[in-house]
């Protein structure tokens, strides 16, 4: 049985408590960088003591995600507004947004990340050596994660 792992139709819904309380949809994803990136996390740290016994411990970790969008798109403009509203500087206050992102997958499943903050972004445009404006990247960190299962069975 074949498995359809196509990402076509993927979108994000981004809500920020102060700047975008109603939220906005992100779907103008970059073609030269991973649109939605979730790095792997270590759930435990392992070591050996002097007698050769394994010692393990776990500690909470921030759940990080990166979204890459087409420069100048409406999605880029909204994410740029969110980034700038939360960037501090001399004489500039942060909006202190609490961010929630819902990832809407083509198979009907969703992932919700909550208790988040925007923590990286780009304060301007960059140009690649090929002459193309670089995709815009925005990073987030979250405290919580939940998911719903697919509504479309694999292989259909």
What kind of region is each of these model predictions?
Residues 1-74, 117-136:
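Solvent-exposed edge beta-strands and adjacent loop segments
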Residues 61-63, 67-93:
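Short, conserved turn/kink motifs that form compact alpha/beta structural patches or helix kinks used as
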Residues 81-112:
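Short, acidic/charged, Gly/Pro-enriched secondary-structure junctions
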């Amino acid at each position: 049985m074949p498995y359809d792992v196509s990402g076509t139709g993927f979108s994000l819904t981004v809500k920020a408590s102060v700047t975008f309380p109603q939220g906005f949809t992100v779907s103008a994803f970059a073609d030269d960088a991973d649109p939605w990136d979730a790095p792997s996390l270590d759930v435990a740290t392992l070591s050996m003591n002097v007698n050769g016994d394994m010692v393990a411990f776990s500690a909470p970790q921030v759940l990080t995600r990166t979204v890459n969008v087409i420069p100048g798109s409406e999605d880029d403009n909204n994410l740029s507004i969110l980034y700038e509203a939360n960037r501090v500087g001399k004489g500039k206050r942060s909006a202190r947004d609490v961010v929630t992102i819902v990832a809407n997958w083509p198979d009907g499943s969703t992932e919700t990340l909550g208790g988040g903050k925007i923590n990286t972004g780009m304060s301007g445009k960059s140009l690649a050596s090929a002459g193309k404006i670089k995709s815009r990247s925005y990073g987030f960190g979250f405290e919580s994660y939940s998911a719903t299962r697919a509504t479309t069975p694999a292989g259909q």
